[in-house]
Amino acid sequence: MNQPLLSVNNLTHLYAPGKGFSDVSFDLWPGEVLGIVGESGSGKTTLLKSISARLTPQQGEIHYENRSLYAMSEADRRRLLRTEWGVVHQHPLDGLRRQVSAGGNIGERLMATGARHYGDIRATAQKWLEEVEIPANRIDDLPTTFSGGMQQRLQIARNLVTHPKLVFMDEPTGGLDVSVQARLLDLLRGLVVELNLAVVIVTHDLGVARLLADRLLVMKQGQVVESGLTDRVLDDPHHPYTQLLVSSVLQN
């Protein structure tokens, strides 16, 4: 493919002075993982909501597969979120149906893309539970009975079961114990490669960014202050703020 999967041009959304983001531009290519890093309040999550069709920007354009995202109907944008895109929330229960079984959470996504045969849907759900290291015998259990790490893995299975082209992740390892984080990152890295996913991941954790991202955007107070290949940005940061971020991690 000789054109970006997602193209963001001069995007702005400011909901208060210094809150939000302004004049952000980047391209995302098929199979590429883009990390967005920066401290809390830098505009990362607001940007993620705008580029994933969940918050209309005030200025700028977003093109997905050469189609203007916000020129589409709201119904078409919702369809993208159900089928070709996935969204992994920091708090997994925000992305799961609490009163629907684990298998049902995965099955709903399959049905959104046209699956109708109950036996096939259940078999695929069981396969994906195993893929994300959840025992298949938990298929009929509610997500609320799972640990935080299992809930996050279930949310990932729900999003990836339809082999989406593009996945948006907001602090997917936030709030998890270090050992649980390590297993989840291992799992994510393997699935990203296996499914050739394009991913935009927001994280404040530079270790997560180094492990998963091909390229980085560094944000400070709503502005992208540095961008480039992950290893270059983290090993040879140019902007004083990026240098500060990297040095603070090294000191810790």
UniProtKB/Swiss-Prot annotation:
InterPro entries: AAA+_ATPase, ABC_transporter-like_ATP-bd, ABC_transporter-like_CS, Oligopep_ABC_C, P-loop_NTPase, PhnK. ATP binds at residues 38-45. Gene3D superfamilies: P-loop containing nucleotide triphosphate hydrolases. GO terms for molecular function: ATP binding; ATP hydrolysis activity. Keywords: ATP-binding, Nucleotide-binding, Transport. Signal peptide: none annotated. GO terms for biological process: organic phosphonate catabolic process; organic phosphonate metabolic process; organic phosphonate transport; peptide transport. Residues 6-246 form the ABC transporter domain. One of its GO terms (cellular component) is alpha-D-ribose 1-methylphosphonate 5-triphosphate synthase complex. Forms a complex with PhnG, PhnH, PhnI and PhnJ with the suggested composition PhnG(4)H(2)I(2)J(2)K. Belongs to the ABC transporter superfamily. Belongs to an operon involved in alkylphosphonate uptake and C-P lyase. Exact function not known. PhnK is not required for the ribophosphonate triphosphate (RPnTP) synthase reaction. This is Putative phosphonates utilization ATP-binding protein PhnK. The gene is phnK.
